[in-house]
Curated annotation (Swiss-Prot):
Protein name as annotated: Glutarate 2-hydroxylase
Top EC category: oxidoreductase
Annotated family: Belongs to the glutarate hydroxylase family.
Essential cofactor(s): Fe(2+)
Record's function text: Acts as an alpha-ketoglutarate-dependent dioxygenase catalyzing hydroxylation of glutarate (GA) to L-2-hydroxyglutarate (L2HG). Functions in a L-lysine degradation pathway that proceeds via cadaverine, glutarate and L-2-hydroxyglutarate.
Assembly, per entry: Homotetramer.
Cofactor binding summary note: Binds 1 Fe(2+) ion per subunit.
Organism: Klebsiella pneumoniae (strain 342)
EC code(s) of this entry: 1.14.11.64
Reactions catalysed according to its record: glutarate + 2-oxoglutarate + O2 = (S)-2-hydroxyglutarate + succinate + CO2
Length: 325
């Protein structure tokens, strides 16, 4: 997929109502569901959690679960089971989530609270060494001199999984749009592992199971290398992946050329989804069988995008990596 390309949308299906929210397959793919909290639910949630600033959620980790309970109660306790079912379902495993009425950078704290509540209904977000918190906020601008592609606006950030260079289990990734100014392009890119045309070819290769070294640049604040293969299997023997092209360190010619072929095969897939994510919305995906990236932006001197991410483990699943826990 080339820069600024988008999957042609199909007519949006009717949303299925639940207490406090609705859900429907997205226009881009039936694997990606769109979940929308009603304005009433969003308002009531923010009122009930107003007593806790985000700093309280940072300092007292149990409050992250409490705000999740408040949100689930407002949704008739039907939200949590639906989130768990969707995220663990191999046929789906991805959500685009929106709280009606949260759509401006002035509501950044409210955005963090809502995303935190959702994430802690399915598990717990890991410590993010880059920010020193359970979440990270970062800004993309027109000019960037950082040491990874995370903030570089004028190139595609290739498809990858999160958590490749840390020891913590990374089952889910949450990516929220907090602000956007003078932006064109930069859609989120998603690829479901089972839709990748070359999965069988690379999964069956002997190098797929060879432990490789993964090392992060200084900005990630992680100094210890980790070792694991690119592919593994879940508890049912299905392929799962832990891969990012920037941080894998091949030890020899064989590994290096194999990784180069794998990267090309991912980036040229015809099944990559291009997903616009408006301010206030967030993607929540199963990191074991979804890869994600970002298309490039059109240059603008005042370009600005602020994102928030959380990544963590499922508390209700044993479908982790089986051979390299």
């Amino acid at each position: 997929m080339n820069a600024l390309t988008a999957v042609k949308p199909t007519p949006a299906p009717l949303a299925q109502p639940y207490p406090g929210f609705s859900i429907a397959p997205s226009a881009q793919s039936p694997r990606l569901l769109e979940l929308t909290f009603s304005a009433e639910t969003t308002t009531q949630f923010l009122q009930q959690v107003a007593q806790w600033p985000v700093q309280a959620l940072e300092y007292k980790s149990f409050l992250r679960f409490q705000v999740g309970k408040i949100l689930d109660d407002l949704c008739g306790n039907q939200l949590q089971p639906l989130l768990i079912k969707t995220l663990l379902d191999r046929a789906e495993g991805a959500l685009l989530i929106n709280g009606e009425g949260i759509d401006n950078v002035s509501q950044a704290e409210e955005m963090v609270k809502l995303a935190t509540a959702v994430a802690h209904l399915i598990g717990r977000s890991n410590f993010d060494a880059m920010s020193g918190q359970y979440y990270a906020r970062f800004v993309v601008k027109n000019v960037d001199n950082s040491d990874s592609y995370l903030r570089q606006p004028h190139r595609v950030m290739e498809l990858h999984n999160d958590g490749t260079y840390v020891e913590e289990q990374t089952d889910y990734v949450l990516m929220m749009k907090i602000d956007e100014q003078n932006m064109q392009g930069g859609n989120s890119l998603l690829l479901h592992l089972d839709d990748w045309e070359h999965l069988d070819e690379f999964f069956r290769d002997p190098l797929a199971r060879r432990p490789m070294r993964w090392a992060a640049p200084p900005s990630k604040n992680v100094s210890k290398d980790v070792f694991h293969p690119v592919f593994d299997v879940d508890s049912l023997g299905r392929p799962v992946m832990r891969y990012i092209d920037q941080f894998v360190q091949p030890k020899d010619f064989e590994e290096g050329t194999w990784l180069s072929r794998l990267s090309d095969a991912l980036e040229t897939s015809k099944n990559i989804l291009s997903i616009p994510v408006p301010v206030g919305k967030f993607l929540l995906i199963n990191n074991l069988f979804w890869l994600h990236g970002r298309d490039r932006f059109t240059p603008h001197p005042d370009l600005r995008r602020e994102l928030m991410r959380q990544r963590g483990y499922f508390a209700y699943s044993t479908n982790h990596y089986q051979t390299h826990q």
